[in-house]
């Protein structure tokens, strides 16, 4: 599912992440404000650096983890350098977001604060979710285990998702239940829309 984005230059990736925040946050007034004052953007930028280090050499894994932990201390957002995150990821507000080592996230995904893409076991190997393209994950949602979230999915605020969610579905509740998406508007939390 995850496409390699190594063909993009590092700075092109950073620019795309910046533009994703500007495009997806109605409160964003300009790129300078976003570049200086958005912890979600800072965390994604630090991840991009750490991920390159993680994949470059075993000798760079420890420095990548250290930078990742410093970023967590500054932003409140924890992204493991081994995770695979697609282009134009937007983490809005961000405090309390956790993305585990084997998580895979597609392109044009929006993640709100308090979200966990976590594991449900301590075993080696794939233990975190795979998230498709154009997915919106509401505030406080927990997406747990080696499950697959399809493209164009909306996950409601505080949902606990422990089973696959097919494309073009909404997942809400504890445990989350899937239903067809009624609201096709981007960035509307399905937990509060009709």
Predicted regions and their residues:
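Left-handed beta-helix
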Residues: 75, 81, 86-87, 92-101, ...
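Arginine residue identity/basic-tract feature
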Residues: 29, 48, 52, 65, ...
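Soluble, non-transmembrane catalytic domains of enzymes that act on hydrophobic metabolites at membranes
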Residues: 1-25, 90, 106-110, 114, ...
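Terminal amphipathic alpha-helical/low-complexity segments used for targeting or macromolecular assembly
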Residues: 1-71, 75, 186-194
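Residues at secondary-structure transition points
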Residues: 40, 58, 62, 80, ...
């Amino acid at each position: 599912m995850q496409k390699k984005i190594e063909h993009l230059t590092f700075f092109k990736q950073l620019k795309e992440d910046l533009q994703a925040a500007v495009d997806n946050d109605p409160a964003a007034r300009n790129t300078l404000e976003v570049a200086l004052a958005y912890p979600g953007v800072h965390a994604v930028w630090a991840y991009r650096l750490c991920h390159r280090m993680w994949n470059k050499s075993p000798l760079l894994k420890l420095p990548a983890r250290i930078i990742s932990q410093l970023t967590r201390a500054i932003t409140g957002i924890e992204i493991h350098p081994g995770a695979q995150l697609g282009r134009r990821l937007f983490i809005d507000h961000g405090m309390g977001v956790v993305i585990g080592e084997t998580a895979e996230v597609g392109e044009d995904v929006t993640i709100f604060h308090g979200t966990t893409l976590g594991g449900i076991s301590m075993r080696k190997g794939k233990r975190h979710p795979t998230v498709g393209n154009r997915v919106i994950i509401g505030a406080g949602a927990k997406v747990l285990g080696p499950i697959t979230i399809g493209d164009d999915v909306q996950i409601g605020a505080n949902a606990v998702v422990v089973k696959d969610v097919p494309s073009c579905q909404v997942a809400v509740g504890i445990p989350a239940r899937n239903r067809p998406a009624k609201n096709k508007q981007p960035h509307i939390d399905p937990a509060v829309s009709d």
